Amino acid sequence: MKTLYSLRRFYPVETLFNGTLAXAGRDQETTGFAWWAGNARLINLSGKLLGAHVAHAGLIVFWAGAMNLFEVAHFVPEKPMYEQGLILLPHLATLGWGVGPGGEVIDTFPYFVSGVLHLISSAVLGFGGIYHALLGPETLEESFPFFGYVWKDRNKMTTILGIHLILLGIGAFLLVFKALYFGGVYDTWAPGGGDVRKITNLTLSPSVIFGYLLKSPFGGEGWIVSVDDLEDIIGGHVWLGSICILGGIWHILTKPFAWARRALVWSGEAYLSYSLAALSVFGFIACCFVWFNNTAYPSEFYGPTGPEASQAQAFTFLVRDQRLGANVGSAQGPTGLGKYLMRSPTGEVIFGGETMRFWDLRAPWLEPLRGPNGLDLSRLKKDIQPWQERRSAEYMTHAPLGSLNSVGGVATEINAVNYVSPRSWLATSHFVLGFFLFVGHLWHAGRARAAAAGFEKGIDRDFEPVLSMTPLN
């Protein structure tokens, strides 16, 4: 099974190093890769590669559990989550655990349970990883043919793809079931400032769900990132879960068509490059989602979005100056435009001043003050509620700006506070990781294509120029 073909033929890159460090079957002589090339040594050792992946999953889940408990231990219920540098508890709160009206945390026990469950799971995964890396069979093909594979076996590869798609679909439906049957999820748009509620009236209309995919990514359109009600989000997960599960069944039952067999490269490194490309796209989309979207990422937990903090500042000073007697409908600003209110290019009444660029912001504390033609002057004069004033003042002072040394706020502000928004961290980290994954995709795709074409660019190490040069010393 292991010697169907010469490994050197398929992995012609030489990595000269001390090959004696590795154990039998994983040394440079048999694999063509030195110890520091990591899992490349395990390309044809399915049992050992399984161990590496299970151990990696254990590390991931251990981080989730340990970081979860760390955040619980440091959590102060009196302060908003976004002031405490939390990135995991906001996700749990968004799922409706431990929070009540207005996003107030009423019970931290579910967060503790989540951390402990992840820690216990990581121990199981860690044991499985060590077992398969050190004790289990090197290859699975002989003893467990269902779990064995050859990278070139196109039918087996699409079967594995199908299994993965079904698991992803089940994951999407877990969110659907949580929202429908198990206590609901947090809805920032619930009247009076947000609350946990069960989603009863799902959006299943394909024109609505797939309409998001057809929207422009620019301006007030915002592609799928513009989704702003939970019915659409949960309905989208029903569609996505169904497509993943049906697609998974399809890939398990069918063999790749001739055009796919010809068009794609069928090797382990090619599959790695495809996966890295997909993860890169996920990273870039997640970056935009957490930066702009305050429905999937409620501002009560993640802090305001950039546009939201800016509009909140305009609103706060409109409230203040209106109380002091200013006529906010007609006051002129220094540029001759309205100081507090002006018209957008399409005629809606919007906030004036620098925040005009964010005129298409939608936020639950602001929408009740809009009429059919933008902000409603009579509502601004009579209907502003104390909770809207409090929330906008809070958001105004917590813009998602900040430097790496955690001095938050506008860089020129002398009263800057020690605050960096989780939105900043999550958006920048996902952008950077998405970029790294994209570079990894290019790298591995190039190597996979070169190997498939039967050539390999590199230095002929038997005749390196440096070998004939005078030693430096």
Curated annotation (Swiss-Prot):
N-acetylthreonine modifications at: T15
Q: Which residues bind [CaMn4O5] cluster?
A: E367
**Mainly localized where?**
plastid
According to UniProt, the name of this protein is: Photosystem II CP43 reaction center protein
Protein origin, superkingdom: Eukaryota
Which ranges are cleaved off as propeptide? 1-14
What are the UniProt keywords, alphabetically? Answer: Acetylation, Chlorophyll, Chloroplast, Chromophore, Manganese, Membrane, Metal-binding, Phosphoprotein, Photosynthesis, Photosystem II, Plastid, Thylakoid, Transmembrane, Transmembrane helix
* Role played: One of the components of the core complex of photosystem II (PSII). It binds chlorophyll and helps catalyze the primary light-induced photochemical processes of PSII. PSII is a light-driven water:plastoquinone oxidoreductase, using light energy to abstract electrons from H(2)O, generating O(2) and a proton gradient subsequently used for ATP formation.
Q: Which GO terms describe its cellular component?
A: chloroplast thylakoid membrane; photosystem II
Q: Does the keyword Acetylation apply?
A: yes
Per UniProt, what is one GO molecular function of this protein? chlorophyll binding
Q: Which residues carry this modification: Phosphothreonine?
A: T15
Q: Which family does it belong to?
A: Belongs to the PsbB/PsbC family. PsbC subfamily.
Subcellular location(s) per record: Plastid, Chloroplast thylakoid membrane
